[in-house]
UniProtKB/Swiss-Prot annotation:
Domain of life: Viruses
Pfam families, sorted: SieB
Places the protein is found: Host membrane
Organism: Salmonella phage P22
Name of the protein this chain belongs to: Superinfection exclusion protein B
Keyword Transmembrane in record: yes
Role, per record: Has a role in the prevention of superinfection by phages that are insensitive to repression.
Cellular component annotations (GO), alphabetically ordered: host cell membrane; membrane
Disulfide-linked positions: none
Membrane topology label: Multi-pass membrane protein
Residues that span the membrane, as ranges: 22-42, 51-71
Keywords: Host membrane, Membrane, Transmembrane, Transmembrane helix
Length: 192
């Protein structure tokens, strides 16, 4: 007897299934066999065609039900996993934005003025060596130090990393004069 139609039928059902899904399907099948009442088994056997041995229709039906349940469980699993990943990514993004926002909100007036000058100078900041504001910004990671230019040993050069440049641009673009005036007023008040 030629069994190629059985092979084709099994290939149809099992194509695209991973080993994990196949194991889940077999577990579902075993659970269905254990849980299904005997009366259902007998009722299905009454409708069993004569060409099939006893209870084959019952087991074929359970196989199909376990196949469908496995597909449903797999789809739900993937939907929930995608939802969790999207939620985790959104929470991570919100947390990173909050850290950046808190970092920029904690800047002093002098540090904000330095960043405004860097934005105005197309992301290049030159300060005299040892500037407290530049050192503070460097410690916070908002600016990175470039090697000193040849012939200018008393000048430190910095740039704003791309990670923070957009935030700096949104906060300080066009505000270097305003911040400089505020800094002058603050210095005058400190001298009094």
């Amino acid at each position: 007897m030629n069994n190629s139609w059985w092979q084709e039928l099994m290939r149809f059902f099992l194509q695209g299934m991973t080993l994990k899904q196949l194991i889940h399907m077999l577990i579902i099948l075993i659970v269905l066999i254990i849980v299904m009442p005997v009366s259902v088994k007998e009722w299905i056997n009454l409708h069993n065609p004569e060409i099939l041995p006893h209870y084959w229709m019952y087991y074929i039906l359970l196989f199909c039900v376990s196949y469908v349940l496995n597909g449903v469980v797999n789809s739900v699993y993937h939907a929930v996993t995608e939802r969790i990943e999207a939620s985790t990514a959104q929470r991570r993004k919100d947390r990173e934005e909050k850290v950046v926002r808190d970092l920029f909100d904690s800047l002093t007036l002098g540090e904000r003025a330095y960043l405004a000058f860097a934005v105005a100078a197309n992301n290049q900041l030159k300060t005299e060596k040892g500037s407290p504001e530049a050192i503070s910004l460097l410690k916070k990671g908002i600016i990175t130090r470039l090697p000193s230019a040849i012939g200018y040993p008393d000048i430190d050069r910095f740039i704003i990393p791309e990670k923070y440049f957009n935030e700096c641009y949104m906060r300080f673009a066009g505000k270097s004069d305003i911040l400089m005036n505020e800094l002058i007023v603050q210095d005058e008040q400190l001298k009094k």
